[in-house]
Amino acid sequence: MTDVTVIVLVGNEERHIARCLDKLAALEARQIVVVDSGSRDRTKAIIFEKIVQYGVVEYHDHQWPGNQAAQFQWALDNLSIESGWILRLDADEYLTDELVDEIKVRLPQVNDDVDGVVLKRRHVVGWLDDAWVKRGMYPTRILRLFRRGKGRSDMKLMDEHIVVDGKVVEVEHDFVDHSLISFEEWKAKHRGYAKREAQSYLSGEESTGEQAAKKAAYYKLPRYFRAVIYWSVRFFLKGAILEGPKAWRWCWWQGLWYRWIVDREIGCAKRARSRS
């Protein structure tokens, strides 16, 4: 048994949750806890099927507090966790077999002064025929594994991170972010993200994680111009242009369109404030 509790946040994830839990089975975690925010599809039924199948899976329903950071912090504060380590996952994410093996071998060997483990995220885009977008995005390093009692959510509205005070180490292998939603669903989801990111920016929230300095520099640039600069860096300097049509399309939508609508939402919010 691996001395880790996996916390998975879900909400209408019938397309993803079975894959996530099936991949976790090989980890042999002490606990797998799914926190649902009132799913209205088959998510809950699928989870209970996996409870019967694997035994270690637990289900908790908690009303959506408005953002992922607050939901995860609720889980940390209220769940009965007995393991020494905690791993945080979304339903559309899963561990590669290589990462499972690495965690099982390395986790017992981590020094006592290490509080967190940084994982490498591989981004696979379902609406681009399951393309793995590498240049300009891989690897994204993110702290997802930490000692019980040593990690906390940064409580940001958008792009939340786990914060630890002690040392961190990095693993060699990947976990995969592979959403199966359609292109239209992706756009609708990112319009919502744009509103939250604009709200986060205007409220003065400071970024955390390894991208904090880059994000601070980005927001010092003029609106809209910075979106073009961001796209240009991803497309030309980081080599997306060399990866083919799928990478071009992803870079356009995620690297330019999304950043553009964030700036549009910031402008709309500023104008609304000035009129009130």
Where do the protein language model's features map onto the residues?
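Cell-envelope/extracellular polymer assembly enzymes that use nucleotide-activated donors
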Residues: 3-5
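Acidic helix N-cap motif at the loop->helix transition within catalytic regions
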Residues: 18, 41-50, 98
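A conserved acidic beta->alpha catalytic loop
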Residues: 23, 36-46, 64-65, 90
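Short beta-strand-to-loop acidic/aromatic patch adjacent to the donor-nucleotide binding site
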Residues: 75, 82-94
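Conserved donor nucleotide-binding strand/loop of the catalytic core
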Residues: 44-78, 82
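Short, well-formed alpha-helical segments that are part of the catalytic scaffolds
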Residues: 12-26
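Short, conserved active-site loop motifs that form the nucleotide-linked donor/cofactor pocket
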Residues: 30, 56-58, 114
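Catalytic-site signature of metal-activated, phosphate-bearing donor transferases
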Residues: 69-73, 87, 97-271
